[in-house]
Amino acid sequence: MEKNIPTLYEWSGGEETLQRLFRLFYDKVLQDELLGPVFRNMAKDHPRHVAHFVGEVFGGPTKYTGEDKGSHAIMIAHHIGKMLDEKKRQRWIQLLLTTADEIGIPDDPEFRSSLLGYLEWGSRIAVINSQQTENPIGETEPMPRWGWGETGGPYVPK
């Protein structure tokens, strides 16, 4: 018997839930003593773009690469030269998980394991790329995809 397993996007609550999550999250970020200065000049539509990016990564519609005209390289470019550090990375994750709890994002162990795995992976990549002066990937690199399974092995810089 085959199971009909939803995508992380579907399980999270989809577009409306992700938009709400990132809107409320970035409201908190702007008020945060550590993260506020990093994001004080963010574009008004930044939370929407991040919701579209994460939605697409989690198996949802291609709104980030479609209507937003984004790409993985463009998302990485937003982090170049930001000089993020471990304290900021951990605070970013903490605020996002707190916001997820507050709005009732699913808290079953399987989903939260996948969510936290993605946040750990993505935020560590953001810190690495924030130390760069040039984008390490090209415009043709595919968008990341995240699901319920395991990673593809350790991160090894090129």
Q: How would you name each of these model-derived features?
A:
Residues 2-8, 19-108, 112-118, 125, ...:
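Heme-based O2/NO sensor domains and their adjacent alpha-helical segments
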